[in-house]
């Protein structure tokens, strides 16, 4: 029996990483059962030292994440040392910005135990609008990211926008782009919960769901408070259940993000029956109907926002007060999200030896 070793990003209650930690093993097991596949043993490689705190404006804590990853490397090393890793086993690293990839490939090559590595890419230095891209304007990060890319057999991206940006900004040779695949992410477990909230009574409020960080332009959301009841969830300290209730009771979800490779909070809102108002850029441009996209220029900077604010306010107001005009487009968006972005079957196929994706 082959083994899939899951190398998770540390689970943080306020982030989807906690849901991933709990649900990815279930998703893999359900896929195996549904298709009647040969069973895999699924082992999660936990780390130590993580906590629920995050560095301000970031997805995780920049110090304790290294403790967590280092202890994962220790555990993986013991598995190789004790003969628990066999030829043909798989590693799924759920955040590819993880030096465990280096250790896995190092041991696999030098101990002559061929394994397959799958890495899911999220944020990184390769995106100049991400916090890593803004804070680490150094020579070493792109070399590190390219090394991890080449060490993986499969690199997974949530959107075509994300994949294209990665390959372009890291100047990946064309002959090596076959390692980069687009797949939705493993979030299907949230679909029933959010659809059940779609009948929640909607209030005349605009929800802004992002981290309070420069790449999300919170100052624009603050400026919109002169025209709307704007709820900035980052300031509220909500747990996941309370956050979903706040989300589902809003008429509009608004983004002015300069950086977005997928946008989980927007998908959560749309499934809850909330109308999205999004810039025509980043991943939004490929994921959502034109009815929900305003010109990117309107919020490409705070200066531009102030210039175009009247047009943006009217754009939001129309969708808030006349939701019936956008019901059909909202249904299309919901179907697209569920079928293409909240499921990861394309990633699971090679992970489970279903030969529909060729590296």
Task: Please describe what each predicted stretch is.
Residues 150-195:
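Donor nucleotide-sugar binding/catalytic pocket of nucleotide-sugar-dependent glycosyltransferases
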Residues 275-278, 285:
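Short hydrophobic beta-strand element within catalytic cores of glycosyltransferases
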Residues 258:
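Aromatic "clamp/platform" in nucleotide-sugar-dependent glycosyltransferases that forms part
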Residues 299-358:
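A charged, aromatic-enriched C-terminal amphipathic alpha-helix characteristic of glycosyltransferases
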């Amino acid at each position: 029996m082959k083994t899939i070793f899951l190398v998770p990003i540390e689970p943080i209650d306020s982030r989807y990483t906690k849901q991933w930690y709990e649900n990815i093993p279930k998703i893999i097991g359900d896929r195996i059962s549904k298709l009647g596949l040969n069973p895999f043993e699924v082992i999660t490689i936990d780390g130590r030292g993580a906590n629920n705190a995050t560095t301000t404006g970031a997805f995780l804590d920049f110090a304790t994440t290294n403790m967590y990853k280092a202890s994962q490397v220790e555990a993986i090393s013991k598995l190789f040392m004790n003969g628990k890793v066999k030829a043909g086993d798989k590693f799924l690293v759920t955040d590819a910005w993880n030096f465990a990839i280096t250790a896995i490939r190092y041991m696999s090559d030098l101990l002559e135990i061929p394994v397959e590595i799958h890495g899911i890419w999220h944020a990184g230095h390769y995106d100049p609008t991400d916090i890593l891209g803004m804070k680490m304007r150094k020579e070493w990060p792109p070399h590190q990211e390219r090394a991890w890319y080449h060490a993986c057999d499969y690199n997974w991206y949530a959107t075509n926008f994300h994949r294209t940006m990665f390959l372009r900004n890291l100047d990946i040779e064309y002959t090596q782009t076959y390692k980069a695949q687009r797949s939705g992410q493993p979030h299907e477990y949230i679909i029933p919960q959010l659809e059940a909230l779609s009948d929640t009574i909607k209030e005349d409020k605009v929800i802004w769901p992002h981290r309070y960080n420069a790449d999300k332009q919170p100052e624009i959301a603050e400026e919109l408070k002169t025209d709307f009841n704007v709820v900035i969830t980052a300031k509220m300290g909500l747990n996941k259940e309370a956050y979903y209730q706040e989300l589902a009771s809003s008429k509009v979800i608004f983004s002015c993000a300069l950086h977005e490779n997928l946008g989980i909070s927007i998908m959560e809102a749309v499934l809850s029956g909330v109308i999205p108002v999004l810039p025509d850029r980043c991943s939004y441009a490929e994921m959502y109907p034109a009815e929900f996209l305003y010109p990117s220029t309107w919020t490409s900077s705070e200066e531009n926002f102030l210039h175009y604010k009247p047009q943006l306010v009217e754009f939001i107001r129309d969708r808030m007060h006349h939701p019936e005009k956008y019901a059909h487009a909202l249904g299309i968006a919901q179907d697209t999200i569920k079928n293409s972005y909240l499921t990861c079957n394309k990633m699971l196929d090679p992970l489970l030896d279903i030969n529909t994706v060729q590296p």
